[in-house]
Amino acid sequence: MTAVKFCGMMRPEDIEACNRLRPEYAGFVFWDMSRRCISRDEAGVLITGLDRSVIPVGVFRDQPLPDITAAAETGIRMVQLHGSEDQEFIDRVKERTGLPVIKAFTVRDAGSVRDSLGIRSDLIMFDSGAGSGVRSDWSLLRDVKEPYFLAGGLDAGNVGEAIKELHPYAVDVSSGIETGGRKDPAKMERFMEAVRRADLAYRKEEI
């Protein structure tokens, strides 16, 4: 089954939708250049209301280690690094927080994909650019065997195609479940339904 990550949770209504739809992951953005950024206090309140079956992920981009360790106190259970963080920094985050790390990479060309596979992290993510809402070139990922999150330009209309073509471990969505810059519960539900339909169709093909 393809895991789902709803990213950019900002409001109690977003948490209510997560608790109803049960994605495997919910992302909370701590990078202050993002319009989806929330404070540690806000994140702590939201995470407290999140069902335990949904893993809260803190999203960071080229931020100092103390910022990440402080945010770890909010209740996040994974760290997502979305910048130019190197292996040494990833290892320090894991050591200081005790949390698993998702390292995100921007898909530019075959070389960027190949280089990303040399990084040691708990999971990797391939994106078209942090929060850009633009789809990456999926053909560059067809030969990747490692489990990964697929992000960038996904919505209910194309996530099924992505799952059929690439079979990622997880799909990550933010702008694709928004209306007017806010999470839209109806779009969140349609996205989950599209993922589950694609999973079911894929399983039938394997039989």
Please name every model-derived segment:
Residues 1-126, 131-207:
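Conserved N-terminal beta1-alpha1 strand-loop-helix module at the mouth
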